[in-house]
Amino acid sequence: MLPLADLRFLMFVDDVYEDLELWYPKLRLIEAGAHVVVAGPKAGEKYAGKHGYPCVSDAAIADMEAADFHGIVIPGGFMPDKLRRDPKVLRLTREFAEFGKPTAAICHGGWIPISAGVYRGVRVTGSPGIKDDLINAGAIWEDAPVVVDRHFVSSRKPDDLPAFCRAIIDVTTRR
C-alpha cells in the first residue's frame, strides 16, 4: 500500500511560482498515493513559473476548505509575495496550522505562513533572502536542508527538495 493512499493535499499556484518547488513535491506526493489539488486565484487558469513552465490550476483558492485536506505544501518563487495578500490564503494556512495538519513551505513559500501569523516559536528554515522576515515573525531560524517542528516542514531551496518531500511524507504518515 502506498504511504499516502487516499490522502488529499493542497498546493497554491500563481504566476512566477518556482517551477521545481511546485512540480517536484506534487509528483512525489502523487507517487506516494496522495491526491493533489493545485489551487490558484482562478480555477482552470494557466499560470507561468519563474522559468516558464505552465501549471493549470485545478480549483480556485476561494473554493478551498482546510477541512477537505490532510496537508498543504506552499512552493516558493515570487508567487507567495502576491498570495500573502489574499485573506483566504492566510485563513487556509492558519487553519492547516491550527488543525495540526502538515504545513510545508519551501524557499520564499515561508512568506505565507509569516503573514498568516503561524510561525511564532516554530523552528523553520527558508530562503536566506527571507531569514530576517522569519526571525521578525517570531520563528526560530535554522540553516538546514529541512527543518521539522511538529507538523511544520520547511526547506531552503530547490536543492533541498528530496529531503523536503521525504519529511512531508514522514510527518504525514506519523499522524
Region roles according to the model:
Residues 107:
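Catalytic nucleophile serine of serine hydrolases
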